[in-house]
Amino acid sequence: MVFEKIDKNSWNRKEYFDHYFASVPCTYSMTVKVDITQIKEKGMKLYPAMLYYIAMIVNRHSEFRTAINQDGELGIYDEMIPSYTIFHNDTETFSSLWTECKSDFKSFLADYESDTQRYGNNHRMEGKPNAPENIFNVSMIPWSTFDGFNLNLQKGYDYLIPIFTMGKYYKEDNKIILPLAIQVHHAVCDGFHICRFVNELQELINS
């Protein structure tokens, strides 16, 4: 893992960062419809497939890898790792696991299945211990679909990393649609960036 510190004085987002981080702290969320027909028709496992696809786009663009590290420094990670929740039916609680990214889905799926098998019965909130600092959070609410979703981070205005939440998929006009909520910090991510993410995610799923 490499964390490259940002020189704010030469950074092209300096005035935007200062405005949305300090003057007017601002996070926002967008909920979009993702066409997952190709995933279902190929018989791929939905959750790990979406984790993989989301991670691929996150790691393409620096705005989704920009963070304040544990030393309070602003910078960009060279890679982000998905941290995802699994649900425990017996206690109605969840645990967070994480799986390192791989360049191909087959390898990622093997590691994902290994992690869920090894740590899936650990009912602690941190199901797989020793999560690295370069993680981003993904969760799924498979019991209901939604048109809007928002996380309220009362003390989280210094949290720059995106958060992804998926809902229950449904059929619409011969397509299978998955709601996806994306929460970002305006200091590092504008509407253009989140829309580019959505478009590239859909293109990757369709390819």
UniProtKB/Swiss-Prot annotation:
The keyword Transferase applies. The keyword Coiled coil does not apply. Keywords: Acyltransferase, Antibiotic resistance, Plasmid, Transferase, Transposable element. Pfam families: CAT. Its EC number is 2.3.1.28. It catalyses: chloramphenicol + acetyl-CoA = chloramphenicol 3-acetate + CoA. It is an enzyme of class 2 (transferase). InterPro entries: CAT-like_dom_sf, Chloramphenicol_AcTrfase_AS, Cmp_AcTrfase. One of its GO terms (molecular function) is chloramphenicol O-acetyltransferase activity. One of its GO terms (biological process) is response to antibiotic. It comes from the Bacteria. The active site is at residue 186. Belongs to the chloramphenicol acetyltransferase family. Homotrimer. This enzyme is an effector of chloramphenicol resistance in bacteria. This is Chloramphenicol acetyltransferase. It comes from Clostridium perfringens. The gene is catP.
